[in-house]
Amino acid sequence: MPTNRNEEMMVYCSFCGKNQDEVQKIIAGNNAFICNECVELAQEIIREELAEEVLADLSEVPKPQELLHILNHYVIGQERAKRALAVAVYNHYKRINFHDSREEDDVELQKSNILMIGPTGSGKTFLAQTLARSLNVPFAIADATALTEAGYVGEDVENILLKLLQAADFNIERAERGIIYVDEIDKIAKKSENVSITRDVSGEGVQQALLKIIEGTVASVPPQGGRKHPQQEMIQVDTKNILFIVGGAFDGIEEIVKQRLGEKIIGFGQNNKAIDENESYMQAIIAEDIQKFGIIPELIGRLPVFAALEQLTVDDLVRILREPKNALVKQYQALLSYDDVKLEFDDDALQEIANKAIERKTGARGLRSIIEETMMDVMFEVPSKENVKLVRITKEAVDGTDKPILETA
C-alpha cells in the first residue's frame, strides 16, 4: 500500500521500472506506460536493423557491365555517358560497403559525384532515374534555379534532402544511401565577363550552399519543408554517402572549348591537336572550361566524374520511339489494346515525329507531346467505335495534312 498521496500518484515505466521523476516524460497507453528513454532505445534498435537491411540490399551492387546492360534496355545512344555512369555508380556503392567494413587504418575512399553535360532532351534526367530504379535506392530530382542562398526568398538546399527523405518514406538510413539529381546547374553559374544576362545573380551563393551537402555534411532538414524556424524539430541527415548527379545543358560551352583548343593549336603547332576529328567538342570539355563558364572550382572538385551527352539525332529519336522496354510506341499500343484496337506507325511517321522534336529543340522529352497531338482525336473517338480494329499513323497524320487511318472489322 502506498504510504502517502504522492506515492499513490507516482507513475512507473512498464519496461524499465523508472518513475516519472527519473525520466523526462512517461507516455500512457492501454494498461501500460513507457518512458522517453525506452522509446529512444526502441528507435535505436529499429534504426540499426533498418541500416543492416539497407547494407544487405547494397552488398550485391551490379557490376559496371551489368549496369550498362540495364541502361541499354531503356536508354538509346549516349554510349560514353552510360559507361561513365555505370563505373561511377558501381564505385560509389562499393565505396560505401568498403567504408562500413574497413579497419581504422585502412585507406579512406572519397566520394565521386557526377557532372552530366548535354543538351536539353538528351537523356540526363532519365539516365539518373534509370540508375536509381535499377539499384532500388531512393531518388530525388531538384531544380537548381529554384534554390536560393540563405536569406533570400526561395528554397533552401536542405529541401532537396527532404525530397529524398519523402522518396525513402522517411527511412533515414535508406535516404542516406540514395541518389539526388540536381538539374539546371548551368543556370546558376556565377557572373563573369562573358556571362549571359539570364544567369542567376546570386548563383555563386547557391553553389556554395550546394557544395556543403554535396561534399558531405550532417544537414538539418525541416520535415514540413520551407524555411527553418526555432520551434521546428529537424531531421538530421548525413550526406556523405548520398550520390549527387548534377546536370545542365551548358549552352555556349562549346565556344569556350573551341577558344581553348584554338589557343593550344596556335601556341604549339598543328601537330598537337587536342581533339580528334571524329570527337565532338562536348567530349573535349575539361574542368577549366566548366570553371570559365561560371561554376566555382570548389564545386567542380566535388564532381570529378564527367559524362558528356551528345545531341540526339533523328535516327536516335526513332530508335527511342521503338526500341526501349518502355518505348512510347509500345506504350500507346498498350493503351489502345485495352479497347481491342491495334496501333501501327508508318516508318516515315516516326521519322516525322523525330524531325519535329529536332525542330522544336526538345529532344527525347518532346516526343510524347508530339504523339499526343497526333493521336488526340483518335484516343477521343476510337473507344466509342466498336467496329474499329486498326489505327495507322501516317506521316501526313503527324504533319497535320491528313487524319490517322482507321480500319474496321
From Swiss-Prot:
Binding locations of Zn(2+): 13, 16, 35, 38
Single GO BP term: cell division
Annotated InterPro entries: AAA+_ATPase, ATP-dep_Clp_protease_ClpX, ATPase_AAA_core, Clp_ATPase_C, Clp_protease_ATP-bd_su_ClpX, ClpX_bact, P-loop_NTPase, Znf_CppX_C4
Entry-linked SUPFAM superfamilies: Glucocorticoid receptor-like (DNA-binding domain), P-loop containing nucleoside triphosphate hydrolases
ATP-binding among keywords: yes
Domain ClpX-type ZB, residue spans: 1-54
Residues annotated to bind ATP: 119-126
GO cellular component: HslUV protease complex
Gene Ontology molecular functions: ATP binding; ATP hydrolysis activity; ATP-dependent protein folding chaperone; protein dimerization activity; unfolded protein binding; zinc ion binding
Entry annotated with the keyword Glycoprotein: no
Gene3D superfamilies per record: 1.10.8.60, ClpX chaperone, C4-type zinc finger domain, P-loop containing nucleotide triphosphate hydrolases
Keywords on record: ATP-binding, Chaperone, Metal-binding, Nucleotide-binding, Zinc
Signal peptide range: none
Quaternary structure and interacting proteins, as annotated: Component of the ClpX-ClpP complex. Forms a hexameric ring that, in the presence of ATP, binds to fourteen ClpP subunits assembled into a disk-like structure with a central cavity, resembling the structure of eukaryotic proteasomes.
Function, in words: ATP-dependent specificity component of the Clp protease. It directs the protease to specific substrates. Can perform chaperone functions in the absence of ClpP.
Similarity annotation: Belongs to the ClpX chaperone family.
Protein's recorded name: ATP-dependent Clp protease ATP-binding subunit ClpX
Organism listed in the record: Streptococcus gordonii (strain Challis / ATCC 35105 / BCRC 15272 / CH1 / DL1 / V288)
Protein's gene: clpX
